[in-house]
């Protein structure tokens, strides 16, 4: 079975064909590190971590690059307010990002490049665009000539004519420096007192879009397999990445474009003005990281997902059920054909554009089968591997000696028809969170 990906560029489901056999080169836009990440950022991190994990489950080697934007107007403003340097502020929130995403079970990226570490490469990239006629200097700034780009904004299903109609009438200071209102900044001269780097055009800093183009091509080559990010990045960020990257290299920048949907809070768009802005840092004080991750997996990555207290509660209950399933004692054998059918169904769900919602349905069908007494070592291994695709890994919990002894004593009491003692032991175990299940095959237990 082939993995199929919904490609934003073509607006179609396409079979995934890597540039190099069994290798996936992925670049996913990471956060601008001026604050704690919000749940929308978390959805992107979790969605593409799941994509990465499924590729690895399917036998691929994944080079996963996700950047930190540590040079940005928002960082400069926040650093000034906090009395820190931009680097100090960025370091603080990069550390917070790593801590928060670790709690969500997000695997470390192959590399997390930082803009500050690629300044020489960014300047060289811009110089190459100027040399080819795709960019120009104006009063110390450098802008990209949108009119010269081939099929500009095709990713966002827009045309230059559409965009020009929307840009007509602009009269701000920056627009006055441009040949065309649609042209976007590759380099911006610094204001007095702002952090800056020396360049042939001015002491300044790069524009947002050029940063990702440079880091992606430096680390993964001129053409990458998959470029991902939130749906809000489709235009202008990813649109402009394509324009400048393909102008420089004359090659396709990315073969597949993937975008995750938004997170709403109680059916409303999350925003600071509505007072429903939820950071992961605060959320993790009351919600377990695995529960939050499992909630984010319950909806297909391209669709919007609604964050509510009930949805989090449901995720918590469902995770507990899966955990209890994993804690069943194993049996010698189970129906291998039924196991194969579950594995096939799971792959079919995930091969269909990483449909986690359908994949989770398979997991619960399999859990029901396991709880009927079909928990062999082979079944256990397959079930754990599927859970790991969703970043769900439970710590091994063994039945300790005391509980084992109590269960044995209860069995002996039942054999001697001392039902009062047997019931007392059951109550004692229940107080410790151990639930006993009397089945035709003997006693089975779960942590309740």
UniProtKB/Swiss-Prot annotation:
ATP binds at residue 272. Its main location: cytoplasm. Its cofactor is Zn(2+). GO terms for molecular function: ATP binding; cysteine-tRNA ligase activity; zinc ion binding. GO terms for biological process: cysteinyl-tRNA aminoacylation. The keyword Cell inner membrane does not apply. Monomer. This is Cysteine--tRNA ligase. It comes from Streptococcus equi subsp. zooepidemicus (strain MGCS10565). The lineage of its organism: Bacteria, Bacillati, Bacillota, Bacilli, Lactobacillales. The gene is cysS.
């Amino acid at each position: 079975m082939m993995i199929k990906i919904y490609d934003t560029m073509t607006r179609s489901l396409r079979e995934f064909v890597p540039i190099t056999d069994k290798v996936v080169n992925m670049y996913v836009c990471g956060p601008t590190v001026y604050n704690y990440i919000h749940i929308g950022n978390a959805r992107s991190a979790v969605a593409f971590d799941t994509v990465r994990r499924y590729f690895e489950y399917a036998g691929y080697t994944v080079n996963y690059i996700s950047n930190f934007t540590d040079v940005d107007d928002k960082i400069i403003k926040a650093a000034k307010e906090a009395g820190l340097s931009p680097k100090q502020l960025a370091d603080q929130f990069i550390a917070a990002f790593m801590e928060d995403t670790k709690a969500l079970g997000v695997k470390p990226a192959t590399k997390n490049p930082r803009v500050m570490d690629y300044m020489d490469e960014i300047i060289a990239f811009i110089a190459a665009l100027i040399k080819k006629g795709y960019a120009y200097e104006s009063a110390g700034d450098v802008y990209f000539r949108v009119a010269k780009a081939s099929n500009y904004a095709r990713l966002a299903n827009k045309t230059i004519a559409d965009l020009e109609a929307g840009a007509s009438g602009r009269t701000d200071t920056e627009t006055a420096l441009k040949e065309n209102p649609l042209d976007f900044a590759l380099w911006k001269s610094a204001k007095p007192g702002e952090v800056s780097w020396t360049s042939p055009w001015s002491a300044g800093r790069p524009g947002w879009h050029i940063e990702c183009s440079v880091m992606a091509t430096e680390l993964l080559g001129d053409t990458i397999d998959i470029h991902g990010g939130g749906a809000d990045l489709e235009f202008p960020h990813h649109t402009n990445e394509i324009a400048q990257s393909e102008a420089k290299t004359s090659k396709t920048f990315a073969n597949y474009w993937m975008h995750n949907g938004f997170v709403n809070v109680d059916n409303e768009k999350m925003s600071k003005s509505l007072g429903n802005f939820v950071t992961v840092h605060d959320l993790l004080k009351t919600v377990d990281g695995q529960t939050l991750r499992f909630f984010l997996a319950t909806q297909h990555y391209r669709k919007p997902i609604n964050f509510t207290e009930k949805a989090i509660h449901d995720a918590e209950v469902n995770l507990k059920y899966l955990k209890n399933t994993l804690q069943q004692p194993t049996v010698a054998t189970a129906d291998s054909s039924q196991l194969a059918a579950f594995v096939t169904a799971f792959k079919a769900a995930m091969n269909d554009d990483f449909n986690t919602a359908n994949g989770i349905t398979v997991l619960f069908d399999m859990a029901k089968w396991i709880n009927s007494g079909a928990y062999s070592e082979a079944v256990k291994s397959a079930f754990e591997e599927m859970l790991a695709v969703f970043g769900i890994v439970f710590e091994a919990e063994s039945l300790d000696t005391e509980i084992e002894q109590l269960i044995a004593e209860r069995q002996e009491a039942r054999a001697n028809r001392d039902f009062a003692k047997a019931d007392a032991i059951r109550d004692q175990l229940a107080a410790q969170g151990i639930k006993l299940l009397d089945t035709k095959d003997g006693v089975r237990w779960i942590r309740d």
